[in-house]
């Protein structure tokens, strides 16, 4: 049991560094609600296997080894072979950035993207994740792929990224109902100020939602051309679903 607890604490530390970026041992201890000496021991062990590295200012950060691990994991997703070309065409035709994300335990993980002209303003990248309640990909997956959305909502109020992030159970529940009714999600500055997106579910041959395709850019442009972008994303989704048919 002690070994399991140590591994659980190590995973929590890794998840915290992935979500928040470099942290001091004191910040990590407070965030994870574990003693600071425990953080030091975990960091030393993870550094020994090149998963965490200490920075010159004594903060802890994920090592560059995670980039290789993420790339290996991405290449292992053989069901998405050929998805890159589809995303490239979508990004080229709309000039927005296209993301393919899959559901995981804590949120939507980006496995592929095609960069638009405004990529510098976006938070999501391949290998990164966003929680289920924020962003077009996360919320469409929460509505249509999460095994128990009500249980997720029981954790509200949830972390806020901007003033537009929905953090209360009531507003999120209404949003999920709207997503199910119209078939896609709309993100309007709920992750990054000035950024919007639309997100659509991608289904396998059995009809199960296995991923989300989202298109993101400046909020004003996404809002002004929403119908056009939804139609373009829908066409790309149809192509992606052929890969899994």
Where are these regions (language model features)?
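N-terminal helix-turn-helix
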Residues: 1-76, 80, 238, 242-243
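Short, structured helix-loop boundary elements
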Residues: 3-7, 63, 76, 80, ...
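Amphipathic alpha-helical regulatory segments at dimerization interfaces
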Residues: 16, 31, 84-93, 99, ...
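Acidic surface patches and DE-rich sequence motifs
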Residues: 55, 104, 204
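Amphipathic alpha-helical effector-binding/dimerization core
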Residues: 58-156
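Cysteine/selenocysteine-centered motifs that mediate thiol-based redox chemistry or coordinate metal-sulfur cofactors
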Residues: 142, 151-160, 237-245
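Extended hydrophobic
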Residues: 165-239
């Amino acid at each position: 049991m002690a070994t399991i607890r140590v591994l659980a604490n190590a995973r929590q530390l890794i998840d915290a560094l992935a979500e928040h970026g470099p942290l001091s041992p004191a910040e990590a201890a407070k965030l994870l609600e574990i003693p600071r000496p425990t953080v030091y021991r975990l960091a030393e062990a993870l550094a020994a296997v090149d998963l965490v590295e200490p920075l010159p200012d004594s903060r802890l950060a994920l090592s560059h080894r995670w980039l290789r691990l993420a790339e290996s994991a991405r290449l292992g997703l053989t069901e998405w072979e050929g998805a890159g070309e589809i995303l490239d065409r979508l990004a080229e035709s709309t000039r927005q950035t296209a993301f393919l994300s899959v559901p995981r335990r804590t949120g939507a993980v980006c496995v592929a993207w095609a960069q638009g002209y405004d990529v510098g303003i976006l938070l999501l990248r391949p290998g990164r994740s966003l929680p289920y309640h924020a962003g077009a990909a996360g919320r469409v997956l929460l509505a249509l792929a999460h095994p128990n959305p009500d249980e997720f909502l029981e954790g509200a109020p949830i972390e806020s990224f901007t003033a537009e992030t929905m953090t209360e159970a009531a507003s999120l529940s209404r949003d999920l109902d709207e997503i199910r009714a119209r078939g896609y999600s709309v993100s309007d500055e709920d992750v990054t100020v000035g950024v919007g997106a639309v997100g659509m579910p991608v289904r396998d041959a059995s009809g199960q939602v296995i991923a989300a395709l989202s298109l993101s850019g400046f909020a004003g442009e996404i809002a002004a051309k929403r119908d056009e972008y939804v139609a373009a994303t829908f066409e790309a989704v149809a192509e992606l679903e052929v890969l899994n048919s």
